[in-house]
């Protein structure tokens, strides 16, 4: 229980600090550093506990593509041929996506599951993920963040895998 509290406070503190610093320094360095900092939350966890194993890598990658497709459906409806992200912003988007997944669906999910079971892990990590974005997104967008968290968390639980959510989240962030 103590580990869960520490992970939750650490994840939210890092996410909110990144959002606040971004307002004064600009998005590219802040997002990249924030993503790397969030990745540090996973230190000390066994890869298997985080859903990171090398077995069945192809299905996990394909699952990530499917997750990305689901997350991008609303954006695809309104897409108007927007250009690709410039490389510095793309690198930052990758860093924050990987960092958020390691933190929210990796360490936080594992701590919630150990303390309260899989349903609490899916719901709790999704709610905390949405709450972590309150400083960086408008209120209505938080519902989309919550929905994305539920999709990513459900995959994490059902497949016992974090590769799919990392791939899906990264592709969605690169496309949005």
Question: Which ranges hold each PLM region?
Answer:
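Functionally important transmembrane alpha-helices
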Residues: 141-176
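Generic transmembrane alpha-helix motif of multi-pass integral membrane proteins
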Residues: 36-39, 95, 107, 150-160
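Structural signal for the C-terminal ends of transmembrane alpha-helices
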Residues: 14-17, 39-48, 73-77, 155-157
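Juxtamembrane helix-entry segments on the extracytoplasmic side of multipass membrane proteins
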Residues: 25-30, 59, 80-91, 138-143, ...
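Hydrophobic alpha-helical transmembrane segments
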Residues: 4-5, 60-65, 90, 119-124, ...
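Alpha-helical transmembrane segments in multi-pass membrane proteins
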Residues: 1-43
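Aromatic-anchored segments of alpha-helical transmembrane domains
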Residues: 8-19, 68-77, 126-134, 170-176
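Function-critical hydrophobic alpha-helical transmembrane segments in multi-pass membrane proteins
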Residues: 76-134
């Amino acid at each position: 229980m103590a580990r869960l509290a520490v992970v939750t406070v650490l994840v939210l503190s890092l996410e909110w600090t990144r959002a606040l610093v971004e307002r004064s320094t600009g998005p590219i360095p802040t997002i990249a550093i924030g993503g790397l900092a969030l990745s540090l939350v996973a230190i000390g966890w066994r890869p298997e506990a985080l859903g990171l194993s090398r077995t069945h890598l192809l299905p996990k990658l394909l699952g990530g593509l499917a997750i990305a497709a689901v997350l991008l459906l609303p954006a695809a409806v309104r897409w108007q041929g927007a250009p690709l992200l410039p490389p510095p912003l793309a690198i930052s988007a990758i860093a924050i996506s990987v960092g958020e997944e390691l933190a929210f669906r990796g360490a936080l999910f594992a701590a919630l599951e150990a303390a309260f079971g899989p349903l609490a892990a899916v719901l709790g990590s999704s709610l905390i993920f949405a709450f972590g974005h309150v400083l960086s997104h408008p209120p209505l967008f938080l519902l989309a963040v919550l929905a994305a968290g539920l999709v990513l968390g459900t995959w994490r639980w059902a497949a016992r895998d974090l590769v799919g959510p990392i791939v899906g989240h990264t592709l969605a962030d690169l496309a949005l």
